[in-house]
Amino acid sequence: MLYSPESFKVSTPSDREIVIERDFNAPRRLVWDAFTKPELVRRWLLGPDGWTMPVCEIDLRVGGAYRYVWRKESTGTNMGMGGVFREVARPERLVATEKFDDAWYPGEAVDTTVFEERGGITKVRLTVLYESKEARDTATRSGMEHGMVAGYNRLEEVLASLIETGAF
């Protein structure tokens, strides 16, 4: 299920939040793994074409850290971010802080990702809570949804491949 207005939804329920929802044709435990295992995260969390992820470190426990660094191969540009896990409720919910190395919005954000499965379809709901309306507005103007659409489309392909090969 590649991008369509029905499969990828973005909303702003408050002046400090962005909520992104997407359905995946895969069981929840597999989608959870794709969000939490570095060898799977590297295959899809890349944004637009031309980016790689040379650093993907995940210490999946409360108080554990994660670190991602992306590289745009054509320019050599790096973009890094990291945070700390506040809640890990396998396979239902992740809560973690988020801060970019070169912050393009003020402050730190808190990401809450919820995984809900119904009939073999897993809905992922990411709620990003920013420190201020200014930070939220900066994020909404950034075009971040384009990179997320590309990444989530890639994730759908990774999940389909794992199911097809029985590799999960």
Which residue ranges define each predicted feature?
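Hydrophobic ligand-binding cavity/cleft-lining segments
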Residues: 1-51
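A conserved amphipathic terminal alpha-helix motif
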Residues: 1-3, 131-168
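Short beta-edge strand/loop motif at the mouth of beta-sheet-based domains
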Residues: 8, 19, 39-78, 166-168
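Intrinsic-disorder/low-complexity, polar/charged segments enriched in Ser/Thr/Lys/Arg/Asp/Glu/Gln
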Residues: 15-21, 53, 65, 80, ...
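Beta-strand/loop substructures that line and gate deep hydrophobic ligand-binding cavities in soluble
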Residues: 17, 95-149
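Hydrophobic/aromatic beta-strand elements that line small-molecule binding cavities or substrate pockets
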Residues: 22, 55-58, 81-87, 98, ...
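A short, structured loop/turn motif at beta-sheet edges
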Residues: 28, 59-61, 86-93, 114-123
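Hydrophobic pocket/interface hotspot
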Residues: 31, 41, 66, 85, ...
